């Protein structure tokens, strides 16, 4: 039984991959035309489809929307009962129907023409009513479904999904849509945390900043280390410019070497040291700490003045891993 199940699963995947392998050679003028129509659309892309095509259509609409192209899904039946009012003359409709002969099209196509709405087709029958009415046709046809009865949409839905991805990615690249643009539409996700957060969003402020003056003693710095528990202290002049850092490691080395606690900290500190810019991306700042094998750093503003402090744990708690 186990072998039979494995064989059935493998056969399905092989058939779907075989059908999908024909898609690249089908991309041509119609694909370019469809992409350009979407690129120049001043409104939204309205995706529609029935049955399994509708389910895939929802995903295509979501992919377009998250990659820089405003889009939403409308079910054809709902469109014919009022939701056509959502679609405006500035919009584009992408209709998905493998047969290209869905009866709802008989009523939808004239309404689109009345509003001068461009129609794009994703179909397995380019010469169907849908294909003939569309300004661009994306061919998703298959020789056979992966279903052993040749009934359940399987290979055809894979082709539909892949064609939708190809269209969305081509448009995305043409728009110059980048990682930060993507993060703005995913602010609650891990990518949003990685790309949208700046150092100043995560840093410790005010009394939580470990700092001493240049005139402070090693003892003062040691007490500040203990108070804040960050593993370092920023050593600043009277203008709050960071002149160095005094770390747990500096303290250990100082004491092992017989240094006195009354010595000015500027004689025991690491001169300069690593500082992070408050306006830098948090992910970039974390990489600096990792690369330099340190766990914390002072944060400075554009003038080099101390404005905060941060350690690796602050990044991890914000989901920047």
From Swiss-Prot:
EC number annotated for this UniProt entry: 5.3.1.13
Which residues are Zn(2+)-binding? 75
The reply to whether Metal-binding figures as a keyword in the UniProt entry is yes
Q: Which residues bind ATP?
A: 49-54
Domain SIS, which positions? 34-177
Which molecular function GO terms apply here? Answer: arabinose-5-phosphate isomerase activity; ATP binding; metal ion binding
Q: Which InterPro entries match?
A: CBS_dom, CBS_dom_sf, GutQ/KpsF_isomerases, KdsD/KpsF-type, SIS_dom, SIS_dom_sf, SIS_Kpsf
Q: What residues does the record give for site: Catalytically relevant? A: 52, 104, 145, 186
Amino-acid positions noted as binding substrate in the UniProt annotation, renumbered to this chain: 68-69, 75, 81, 107-116, 141-143, 215, 267
Family membership, please give it: Belongs to the SIS family. GutQ/KpsF subfamily.
PANTHER family, sorted: ARABINOSE 5-PHOSPHATE ISOMERASE GUTQ (PTHR42745:SF2), PTHR42745
Subunit arrangement?
A: Homotetramer.
Stated role? Catalyzes the reversible aldol-ketol isomerization between D-ribulose 5-phosphate (Ru5P) and D-arabinose 5-phosphate (A5P). It is also able of sustaining the biosynthetic pathway of 3-deoxy-D-manno-octulosonate (KDO), a unique 8-carbon sugar component of lipopolysaccharides (LPSs).
What is the name listed in the Swiss-Prot or TrEMBL entry for this protein?
Arabinose 5-phosphate isomerase GutQ
Q: What organism, scientifically named, is this protein from?
A: Escherichia coli O6:H1 (strain CFT073 / ATCC 700928 / UPEC)
- Quote the gene name from the UniProt entry: gutQ
């Amino acid at each position: 039984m186990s072998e039979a199940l494995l064989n059935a699963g493998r056969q399905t995947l092989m058939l779907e991959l075989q059908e999908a392998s024909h898609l690249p050679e089908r991309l041509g003028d119609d694909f370019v035309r469809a992409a350009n129509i979407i690129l120049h659309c001043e409104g939204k892309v309205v995706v529609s489809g029935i049955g399994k095509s509708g389910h895939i259509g929802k995903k295509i609409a979501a992919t377009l929307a998250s990659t820089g192209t405003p889009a939403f899904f409308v079910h054809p039946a709902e469109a014919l009962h009022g939701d056509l009012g959502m679609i405006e003359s500035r919009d584009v409709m992408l209709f998905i129907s493998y047969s290209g002969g869905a009866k709802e099209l008989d009523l939808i196509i004239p309404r689109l023409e009345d509003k001068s709405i461009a129609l794009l087709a994703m179909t397995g029958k380019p010469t169907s009513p849908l294909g003939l009415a569309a300004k661009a046709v994306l061919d998703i046809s298959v020789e056979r479904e992966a279903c052993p009865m040749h009934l359940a949409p399987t290979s055809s839905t894979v082709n539909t999904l892949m064609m939708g991805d190809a269209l969305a990615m081509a448009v995305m690249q043409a728009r110059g849509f980048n990682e930060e643009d993507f993060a703005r539409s995913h602010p609650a996700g891990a990518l949003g945390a990685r790309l949208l957060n700046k150092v100043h969003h995560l840093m410790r402020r005010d009394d939580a900043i470990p700092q001493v003056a240049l005139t402070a003693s090693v003892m003062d710095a040691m007490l500040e280390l203990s108070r804040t528990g960050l593993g370092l202290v920023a050593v600043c002049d009277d203008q709050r410019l960071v002149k160095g850092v005094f770390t747990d490691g500096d303290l250990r080395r100082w004491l092992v070497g017989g240094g006195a606690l009354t010595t000015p900290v500027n004689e025991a500190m690491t001169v300069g040291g690593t500082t992070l810019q408050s306006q830098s991306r948090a992910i970039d700042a974390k990489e600096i700490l990792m690369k330099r094998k340190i766990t914390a750093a002072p944060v400075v503003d554009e003038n080099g003045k101390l404005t905060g402090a941060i350690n690796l744990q602050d990044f991890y708690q914000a989901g920047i891993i």
